[in-house]
Amino acid sequence: MSKYKDAKELAGLTLGQKTDYIDQYDASLLQPVPRSLNRSDLNLGESLPFTGYDIWTLYELSWLNSKGLPQVAIGEVRLPASSPNLIESKSFKLYLNSFNQTRFDSWQQIADTLQKDLTACAGQEVDVTIQPLEDFTDQTVINFAGNCIDEQDIEINSYDFDAQYLKDAAEGEIVTEDLHSHLLKSNCLITNQPDWGSVKISYKGKQINREKLLRYLVSFRNHNEFHEQCVERIFTDIMKFCQPELLTVYARYTRRGGLDINPYRTNQGKTPSDNFRLARQ
């Protein structure tokens, strides 16, 4: 269980509350969550050990054109990991719903409105693109590169989070490898609803024991934290216990409410230019 579930900054969230669905544009529906809540718990200061983005895909984006004809698109939002706030996902959904019966003059006006409002909520400039559905005609479902660590014949009896599974997990020769798991599951900090994801860990350093890494990832199964916070916890725990020279942690979560969240954290300064779906997305 997260130590900050009862933080005063979370008290006013619509998440977990009965809410009305507004179909007229209303930017005030967006709700920020300070990233400092979990970063204080991780002993992270202002100088972060990573860069990256939260990559959101907006599958239920619809509005009316100037003549009242409904329009649909798929949107992508890239929210910098350096922003003071993350955006709470239910409030994001409610905000997008408020476009549904609102007339806009152009697609560019939609993109500009999203960019302005999300930047204000996050506290730092975000990148927004919206695309027509036909742009996705030939887009394939992909799998993460590298080796999957899930097919191990091990017995697990505890599903409570424990970073100590990573103790002494990195030994031996220096390697560069990509590992991934589809068994990442945590729970919403407020509602306890399950969050399902796949995670890729790319690193250069002493080789990480795959059994210990898998046990660590499975220990998130009863853990309560937002998607972005889980990924930052994975990054900082691996850096603490395994001390790789280079590390990237990239998780892609299944969608909820027409949104998926794909946090990316790295100390290599690179971010993915694409946003390809995995099988469960």
Curated annotation (Swiss-Prot):
<comment type="subunit">
    <text>Homodimer.</text>
</comment>
<dbReference type="GO" id="GO:0006400">
    <property type="term" value="P:tRNA modification"/>
</dbReference>
<dbReference type="InterPro" id="IPR029500">
    <property type="entry name" value="QueF"/>
</dbReference>
<comment type="similarity">
    <text>Belongs to the GTP cyclohydrolase I family. QueF type 2 subfamily.</text>
</comment>
<feature type="binding site">
    <location>
        <begin position="89"/>
        <end position="90"/>
    </location>
    <ligand>
        <name>NADPH</name>
    </ligand>
</feature>
<feature type="binding site">
    <location>
        <begin position="87"/>
        <end position="89"/>
    </location>
    <ligand>
        <name>substrate</name>
    </ligand>
</feature>
<feature type="active site" description="Thioimide intermediate">
    <location>
        <position position="188"/>
    </location>
</feature>
<feature type="binding site">
    <location>
        <begin position="227"/>
        <end position="228"/>
    </location>
    <ligand>
        <name>substrate</name>
    </ligand>
</feature>
<comment type="function">
    <text>Catalyzes the NADPH-dependent reduction of 7-cyano-7-deazaguanine (preQ0) to 7-aminomethyl-7-deazaguanine (preQ1).</text>
</comment>
<keyword id="KW-0963">Cytoplasm</keyword>
<dbReference type="InterPro" id="IPR016428">
    <property type="entry name" value="QueF_type2"/>
</dbReference>
<protein>
    <recommendedName>
        <fullName>NADPH-dependent 7-cyano-7-deazaguanine reductase</fullName>
        <ecNumber>1.7.1.13</ecNumber>
    </recommendedName>
</protein>
<dbReference type="Pfam" id="PF14819">
    <property type="entry name" value="QueF_N"/>
</dbReference>
<dbReference type="InterPro" id="IPR050084">
    <property type="entry name" value="NADPH_dep_7-cyano-7-deazaG_red"/>
</dbReference>
<dbReference type="GO" id="GO:0008616">
    <property type="term" value="P:queuosine biosynthetic process"/>
</dbReference>
<dbReference type="GO" id="GO:0033739">
    <property type="term" value="F:preQ1 synthase activity"/>
</dbReference>
<feature type="active site" description="Proton donor">
    <location>
        <position position="195"/>
    </location>
</feature>
<keyword id="KW-0560">Oxidoreductase</keyword>
<comment type="pathway">
    <text>tRNA modification; tRNA-queuosine biosynthesis.</text>
</comment>
<dbReference type="InterPro" id="IPR029139">
    <property type="entry name" value="QueF_N"/>
</dbReference>
<dbReference type="GO" id="GO:0005737">
    <property type="term" value="C:cytoplasm"/>
</dbReference>
<feature type="binding site">
    <location>
        <begin position="256"/>
        <end position="257"/>
    </location>
    <ligand>
        <name>NADPH</name>
    </ligand>
</feature>
<dbReference type="Pfam" id="PF14489">
    <property type="entry name" value="QueF"/>
</dbReference>
<dbReference type="InterPro" id="IPR043133">
    <property type="entry name" value="GTP-CH-I_C/QueF"/>
</dbReference>
<keyword id="KW-0521">NADP</keyword>
<keyword id="KW-0671">Queuosine biosynthesis</keyword>
